[in-house]
Design a protein with these regions (language model features):
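Leucine-rich solenoid repeat scaffolds
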Residues: 37-58, 193-221
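Ankyrin-repeat boundary/"N-cap" motif
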Residues: 2-10, 33-40, 63-68, 91-105, ...
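Alpha-helical adaptor scaffolds
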Residues: 127-131, 135-155
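N-terminal segments that cap or nucleate solenoid repeat domains
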Residues: 2-33, 72-95, 99
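Conserved ankyrin/ankyrin-like repeat signature
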Residues: 19, 52-53, 77, 110-114, ...
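Ankyrin repeat domain, specifically the short helix-to-loop turn at the C-terminus of the second helix
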Residues: 22-29, 55-62, 82-88, 116-124, ...
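Ankyrin-repeat and related helical/solenoid repeat scaffolds used for protein-protein interactions
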Residues: 161-202
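Ankyrin repeat A-helix N-terminal signature
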Residues: 10-15, 44-50, 68-74, 102-111, ...
Length: 221
């Protein structure tokens, strides 16, 4: 007999929301299942770009954990978690991220509000993920193209020239992704437009290659 947990994660990976809903209807406890890496079903779905499935799973859960609440931008649930256990603002997920990394990367719901709440509770704006990605929340926000979260993190003192593996700065990611507002905020906060990644590429070169002419002009000014 197929393990129901395996069936759930198989359905998530296949993007089969109907199958997920059927499995959860038959066994609501499956919503609390975790994959082989200890990642919850809702987060597993988000990592695979399956937001609708993540929302379906979240709707069945009696309570979201701090990472799920942060990732889905559910500030009411997040505030309740932080009020009960303030230390959750600095705890790590099974895969090495802080809760602040999740609204920064996913940008779902009230991601900016979730970020502010976590920072107010003591989250480290410059915390690096304890995994091979070794990213700070600002890297996550610029990679995800979430200008509002970028602004929150910069206002909280994020290191605008911090490097992630391969030498990428937040400005590299924002320029490549065409996030004009984020590029503007990063420059205003002192980001170095001449910074090169490990293969010698600057932000303006990435913007030019991607056809982001307005950002090229901004970086040239």
């Amino acid at each position: 007999m197929t393990d129901p947990g395996s069936s759930l994660f198989g359905a998530i990976d296949a993007g089969d929301i109907a199958a997920v809903d059927t499995l959860l209807a038959n066994d609501r406890d499956l919503a609390a299942a975790r994959d082989g890496d200890g990642v919850s079903a809702a987060m597993h779905a988000l990592y695979r770009g399956q937001r609708a499935i993540a929302e379906s799973i979240a709707a069945v859960l009696p309570e979201l954990d701090v990472f799920e609440a942060a990732a889905l931008g559910r500030v009411d649930r997040l505030r309740a978690q932080l009020a009960a256990q303030p230390a959750l603002a600095t705890t790590r997920s099974a895969d090495g991220f802080t809760a602040l990394h999740f609204p920064a990367f996913f940008g779902i719901g009230d991601a900016a509000g979730a970020s502010r709440d976590l920072l107010a509770a003591g989250a480290d704006v410059n915390a690096r993920s304890e995994n091979s990605m070794s990213v700070q929340p600002l890297h996550s926000a610029t990679a995800g193209g979430h200008d509002d979260v970028v602004a929150v993190l910069i206002d909280a003192g994020a290191d605008v020239d911090s490097r992630q593996p391969q030498g990428w700065t937040p400005l590299h990611a924002a320029a490549m992704n065409g996030s004009f507002r984020s590029v503007d905020r990063l420059l205003a906060a002192g980001a170095d437009p001449a910074a090169r990644n490990d293969v010698g590429t600057t932000a303006i070169e990435l913007a030019r290659a991607a056809g982001h002419d307005a950002i090229v002009a901004l970086l040239s000014s």
